[in-house]
Amino acid sequence: GVRNEAFMNLFDILGPVMVGPSSSHTAGAVRIGYISEKLLQDHVRKAEILLHGSFATTGIGHGTDKALIAGLLGMHPDDIRIPASFDLAKKVGMEFTFSTVTLKDAHPNTAVLRLSGEHGRKIEVQAASIGGGRILIAKLDGIEVNFTAEKPTLIVHNVDQPGHVAQVTSMLAERNVNIATLQLYRDKRGGYAVMVIETDQEVPQDSVEWLEQLNGIIKVTYINVED
């Protein structure tokens, strides 16, 4: 009957996303989009997405492409609207393109997302789906980093001069925020450095704003995915 047919159609739509061996990487792709949008700290107006490795060979049409866009729209991996993400993106005026790329020394399930926001913010994120719906952020704006975004994470771009690490760590200590990991990356050519700090507690919003106005701090990004 009609009802049975409707059910079949729904199953056809949801099938590739919910079942099968690719589902953990589909979940990973949604999370890559979701975290990238949080890192942009703005609604995505334009996305240029490059797929590498097995994402490039199976990504288009296997749901990876739709999953990435769904994440950029703020969806979670269990959202039933994922298969319709392209249409939903068009409705909110998000432009997006997909192409393939070959990266050196990158994980096989890797995507590079070049994003522009509604308020002029821009970011380039290179991230990998590492299985089980987990992801690894490998590069931010061309600088190699290494974090999962599973804990509250504070990312500080600053001019590479003494004192900035101490400013940030002492501020966190004052606010009783415990540092779980601190990684420091330096871009010799650009003369700036990036701190990636994972914390055990949330970082208060006013602390983030205080950091932003410090001399020599270029950009502060804070994500707490419990949001």
Regions found by a protein language model. Give the residues of each.
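Generic secondary-structure signature for well-ordered alpha-helical cores
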Residues: V19, I35-D42, L73-P77, K91-E95, ...
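Non-transmembrane, aqueous-exposed alpha-helical and coiled segments at domain scale
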Residues: L39-E48, P108
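Short glycine/threonine-rich loop-to-helix capping motif typified by GTGT followed
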Residues: T58-K66, P108, V194-Q201
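Contiguous domain-boundary segments centered on the initiation and propagation of an alpha-helix
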Residues: L73-I123
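A conserved regulatory-domain signal marking ACT and ACT-like small-molecule sensing domains
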Residues: A84, F98-V101, V125-D227
